[in-house]
Each structure stands twice: as C-alpha cells, then as structure tokens.
Amino acid sequence: MSVDRLYRNLMNKLINANIDLDAYLQLRKAKGYMSVSENDHLRDNLFELCHEMHQHAPRLQHAVAAEEKEALRLAGEAVASAAVCLLSGHHDCPSYIAVDVDKLESCLAVLRLNIHKLNDSQPITHA
C-alpha cells in the first residue's frame, strides 16, 4: 500500500472513530448508561485503531510534515485515552457501564480538533 493510501486509510478510520465516539456519547447522555456489549464493541474498535496507527507510524514518520506528525500523535492519544476510559465502569452493575462522560468528551474534542488539522494540511509528500 502506498504512503498516500495508508495516510488516507488512517484518516478515514480516525473520522469513523470520531463518528462512533460521538454517537456513543449521545446515546450515553440520552439513556444515562450503556450496555456492556455496546461499550466493549467501541472499546475494541478503538484499541484496534491504536494498534494500526502504532504499526504504521514508522512508515508515515518520514512522509508527513512535523505538524501532521504531531496531529496524528495527538489523535492517536485521544483514541487511546477514550479506549482506556471505556475499560472502567463494570463496578456498579455487571450489565451496564457507567463511564466518565467528561473524559470521553475531552477525548472526542481532541480527536476532532486534530482531524480538522490533518484535513487542512497539505497533501503528504512521498518519502
């Protein structure tokens, strides 16, 4: 896979993670809780994206500008923080999850900001 294609693929996955996290938060606010399966599904997807970003980072490292590299790093941190936040919450009731909505909203805001930065940046150059 070319570096351009890899970059676009990761960008699309970050955008999808943003959409999924936003939808999760809206449902969480409306219902007041989330089921274990809903929580685990999102958490697993976020951890999978973290793994993929970490796996492809060396290939992208020399192909992107410093600003893009920093935005990718911060977006990855936001995804990882959201996934870790979703690890907690089984304590109150084994069937439902009570996550820290403020932490998830903070992760979503950082992710959204860095997606915008990446979308506004110039196309990457080939290494």
Protein language model features and the residues they cover:
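Short terminal alpha-helical segments
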Residues: 1-46, 108
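Short, charged, amphipathic alpha-helical segments
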Residues: 8, 36-47, 69-77, 95-106
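Amphipathic, well-ordered alpha-helical segments in soluble domains
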Residues: 13, 17-20, 45, 49-56, ...
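Leucine-rich amphipathic alpha-helices with coiled-coil/heptad-repeat character
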Residues: 21, 28, 60, 64-67, ...
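Charged, low-complexity interaction regions
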Residues: 26-37, 61-66, 87-98
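Short, solvent-exposed, charged loop/turn and helix-capping segments
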Residues: 48-73
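Amphipathic alpha-helical binding modules
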Residues: 76-127
